[in-house]
Amino acid sequence: MLSTKIDAENAENAAEIEMQFAVKAVEQAQIYWSLLEMRKGSELKLTKYDDEIFEDLINTFPEFKDPKTASFVNEDEMKSAKGKAAWRPFLMRYEKKVDDYNFGTLLRIKNTDEYEQETTIFVPRMQFLAYEIARNRYGLNDWIKKD
């Protein structure tokens, strides 16, 4: 039995666990990209809560009323102490609604990029959903669909 508590926020993950998360994140990215190739993003529904998530996003972060905000992720800003404090309440509102709401997911930095190591960042699933739902609503992912 452990005599000290483990701080999950600061604990170092075993390499195997990190690899499993990375594999899942890549699989999810490949599936999402395939969906975008088959159907315009503006026609996709990612969850049954898309309308609520989008409305909550623009109410919580009014800058998302401008499609340009959804087109680019400022990783430094998002992952700063101020950014984390702003996003945390948004994420937590979906803890009991969206499965794996905090699971690590790959998000494209720019909506004009494909999924590549240099063009993606690792974020909680709810941040991915917030950005991608907004991108889809604004038609920013429609270019991906193959004819």
From Swiss-Prot:
It comes from the Eukaryota. InterPro entries: PBDC1-like_dom_sf (IPR023139), PBDC1_metazoa/fungi (IPR008476), Polysacc_synth_dom (IPR021148). Keywords: Cytoplasm, Nucleus. Its main location: cytoplasm. Belongs to the PBDC1 family. PANTHER family: PROTEIN PBDC1 (PTHR13410:SF9). This is Protein PBDC1 homolog.
